[in-house]
């Protein structure tokens, strides 16, 4: 029995879309991203969606959304529980907003 260490996870349809977007020369903040954000928001039943470049950016944007929300659920100096073992990108956005890290 053979188990490959890796395999291609992209189908022909996905590859064609990648090529189309790359061929336009603008694959960040372009029309394709705008369409995806709108379709994603519709699919999950929300008003707006925001596509970001990485999980690290998603952490930062999500934290900013909580920090600047009208009822301000997070304030500078608040304590946030975080895992002791994680990536630096878990911690940096929290420190950037002046939150205190509590490692578990």
Would you name each region that the model predicts?
Residues 1-75, 96-97:
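Conserved PLP-binding active-site segment in aminotransferase class I/II-type PLP enzymes
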Residues 68-104:
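PLP-dependent aminotransferase-like
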């Amino acid at each position: 029995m053979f188990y490959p260490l890796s395999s291609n996870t992209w189908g022909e349809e996905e590859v064609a879309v990648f090529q189309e977007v790359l061929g336009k020369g603008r694959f960040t903040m372009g029309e394709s991203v705008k369409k995806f954000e709108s379709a994603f928001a519709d699919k999950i039943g929300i008003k707006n969606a925001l596509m970001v470049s990485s999980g690290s950016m998603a952490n930062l944007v999500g934290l900013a959304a909580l920090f600047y929300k009208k009822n301000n659920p997070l304030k500078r100096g608040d304590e946030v529980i975080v895992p002791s073992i994680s990536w630096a990108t878990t911690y940096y956005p929290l420190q950037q907003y002046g939150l205190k890290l509590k490692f578990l």
